[in-house]
Amino acid sequence: ERYLLNEVNTKIRLIRSRDNFCLMSTGQFKVKIMAASLLVRKVKVSPSVFLAHAKTLEKSLAKYPVRRVVCKTFTIPNGHLDATNEKLFTGQLPRRIVIGMVDNEAFNGAFGHNPFNFKHFSLNEIALYLDGQPHGIKPLAMNFAAHQFIHAYQGLFTGTGKENRDEGNCISRTDFENGYALYAFDLSPDLGEDDHFNLTRQGGVRVDLKFTDALPNTVTVIAYAEFENVIEIDRNRNVVFDFGL
């Protein structure tokens, strides 16, 4: 963690969800915010440190490594047995991707549906391709009807840097097939979950999905991706970044 320099113009924008998205009920209820407060911690540094920072900024920029998060969605109509998104991500390749699927009605907001109920929809194969090359030795295969999905479940640990560590993710194997079917992929070159950043790579990400049974209703696919970027600040407090890649 790094503290933000003083006198840097900072804006925070909060966008709340619709009532029919954040509430589950049988009636038409609504959320009314009566008051809200944002608490921000401020650190006061010693004068010697402040002067040292000012002197350093005369020769170089302050650099802040950040993990940028981008979420993309696409829909699969009911009755389909497979789906492909050729341009899931283009430009800078993400470090990590997590894919989940929910009912389209729940995603758009419905009081009787849970938008965080990530069903498996009888998915039997999911594959990622980077610039046309498959990620991994073979596609991730599973058979939920026979409760055979351990490789996909293990991906929640290998894809998030929790494998071989004395910590979990609060999702059990039983939970995975009952509303927590999330498919994680580590796309970093060294497959390491450390504090270091890797070299930026450019390309495109494609995803292929295959289902055992035809989809009973329209499904929304949600792709969560993490990118490694750097924010730079000069002595005049000008902020420089390039998130377009």
Task: Locate each region found by the language model.
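Flexible assembly/topogenesis modules
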Residues: E1-L245
